[in-house]
């Protein structure tokens, strides 16, 4: 079950190749080093998106700008803790060495990294990249755009199912500081302990702003699995707003400020203090229906 979600946290490195445009090789240097991920490319633009209403320009950024900004991050090395090859007892030392509020995007003086870092990620023991037919998905998307047929959430869902591109992720945005580092540590431990599968966090940008933590699931059409991941995130101590986005939107370059006025997030989760054993209320954004 972890394969698709694991593929969603695979980054691209310099010179990476393969028939699939988002596939690349690994160049790990141990848990404390820099690693280029296996499988498909990581999400472009996640640290900049998901906060506003769909459509148009927002904060001066178009969907194309968001994609281009983070594509550069995808090309840089990542800091990775790989539970498949590294003892869980080493996680705390790794977290202490690379707190996301201190790791900088371009390796600023005084930061733990001297070189650029695209993402910080934790792979669970079930990590096994499998992104589906991304090339076929993108070709079908190009054909759809030139066909004149309507582009709706339903058509994108069907494209994803047809090409087996089913992974998705819960996103949470936090300002740099203790709360971010504490939240990331909780998520990382949940991944290593098996409650969650794969996760990543963006490094601190030079211009500041919130950083994003992404927690992946195998299948965005599996509502129960998506809700179980939400519960595990809440159990890890996360209380901020969460939004859930299928990876098909990212592969096709569809962000919040897109020309089709599509909302790329399916679900919204808000922490609920008391009254609910699961600790959150989850809203189906497309249908405006509470699921929990």
UniProtKB/Swiss-Prot annotation:
Biased composition, class Basic and acidic residues, residue ranges: 35-44
PTM annotation (Omega-N-methylarginine): residues: 29
InterPro entries in the cross-refs: Bles03, TIF_eIF4e-like
Region described as Disordered: 1-60
Keyword Phosphoprotein: no
Transmembrane annotation, as ranges: none
GO molecular function terms noted in the UniProt entry: RNA binding
Key words of the record: Methylation
Low complexity bias spans: 1-11
Top-rank taxon, per record: Eukaryota
UniProt family annotation: Belongs to the UPF0696 family.
UniProt name for this protein: UPF0696 protein C11orf68
Species this protein is from: Homo sapiens
Record gene name: C11orf68
